[in-house]
Amino acid sequence: MERLIFYITLITFIFLLFLYPIFIKWLKKRQFGQYIRKEGPDLHNYKQGTPTMGGILFILAIFFLSLLTYFIQKEDLFLIIGVASLLFGFIGFLDDYLSIKKKDSTGLTAIQKLLLQFLFSIVIVYLISIFNNHSTLKIPFTTKSLDLKFFYPLWGIIYLTGMSNATNLTDGIDGLSGGIYVISALFTALIAGINFNHIPLLILPVIAYLFYNIKPAKIFMGDTGSLALGGILGSLALYYSVELFTILTCFIFISEMFSVIIQVGSFKVRKKRVFLMAPIHHHFELKKWSEERIVLIFWTINILTGIVALGGVL
């Protein structure tokens, strides 16, 4: 039955490769295009109108495959991943839809988005407590664990919210966020010890999307996809207590998020910016790095930190 899941995932991947061009045409016909942030780099202005919400297809694929795995194999993790992909994808969908409707890059307000993330994080943390109740964090490069006791639910909510924001912030260059997700999910799943036949369902749908998102991108995942990817990664890490490992397996996502925190904090306290622009990939764009160079270097860095993380499993 494990091989069955693998073969169905493979068929789904091939199906998505053929479905994405049709979906792109459908989005163009309905003028569901991306609105570029005014405060973003001028280099991105030519991307205005590129079809967005491409995350819908890979989210539905991951949701379907996750539920199938849950019902066939009784793997509780995949019920949680399926629910997380749908809930966080819904937040992103609302944001994208409102942005398109208002013909502006702003959809949900920051507070609205954060409240929904907190609410859905509570749901996921509650589900994890039902199926795999624990309060510990595995510490890399040791055999020890850190017990957070009654603080663990709060930690889980903050962690999951942070991870969904991290993946969202990284989605700013063609091929960047999707590629980093594939690398991060692969290494996190290997560290968690997931069955090899089940790992492809986490990454192949996103690889199908990447075929059409590598520069020049024919479609963007939108917040629909980027928020969902963070929900999936965060749920996986929380379920197996490997959150500390994701500092390495999700190194670029974490770095992008902290570059924004550092930038905002520095400007509020010192009235000075640390980076030319945050998230940090925009800093390198303004340094005249090409998108291809940034993506290649960021992918490579995340692969290397992922390998280091594997060495931390004792």
UniProtKB/Swiss-Prot annotation:
Example GO biological process: cell wall organization
GO CC annotations on file: plasma membrane
InterPro entries on file: Glycosyl_transferase_4, PNAcMuramoyl-5peptid_Trfase, PNAcMuramoyl-5peptid_Trfase_CS
Keyword Repeat: no
EC number(s) reported in the record: 2.7.8.13
Pathway where this protein functions: Cell wall biogenesis; peptidoglycan biosynthesis
Name of the top EC class for this enzyme: transferase
PROSITE patterns: MRAY_1, MRAY_2
Keyword Transmembrane: yes
Cell compartment(s), UniProt: Cell inner membrane
Keywords (A to Z) from UniProt: Cell cycle, Cell division, Cell inner membrane, Cell membrane, Cell shape, Cell wall biogenesis/degradation, Magnesium, Membrane, Metal-binding, Peptidoglycan synthesis, Transferase, Transmembrane, Transmembrane helix
Residue ranges crossing the lipid bilayer per the database entry: 4-24, 52-72, 77-97, 111-131, 146-166, 169-189, 191-211, 219-239, 242-262, 294-314
One protein family per Pfam: Glycos_transf_4
Main location: membrane
Cofactor(s) annotated in UniProt: Mg(2+)
GO molecular function, one term: UDP-N-acetylmuramoyl-L-alanyl-D-glutamyl-meso-2,6-diaminopimelyl-D-alanyl-D-alanine:undecaprenyl-phosphate transferase activity
Catalytic reactions on record: UDP-N-acetyl-alpha-D-muramoyl-L-alanyl-gamma-D-glutamyl-meso-2,6-diaminopimeloyl-D-alanyl-D-alanine + di-trans,octa-cis-undecaprenyl phosphate = di-trans,octa-cis-undecaprenyl diphospho-N-acetyl-alpha-D-muramoyl-L-alanyl-D-glutamyl-meso-2,6-diaminopimeloyl-D-alanyl-D-alanine + UMP
Protein name: Phospho-N-acetylmuramoyl-pentapeptide-transferase
Gene assigned in the entry: mraY
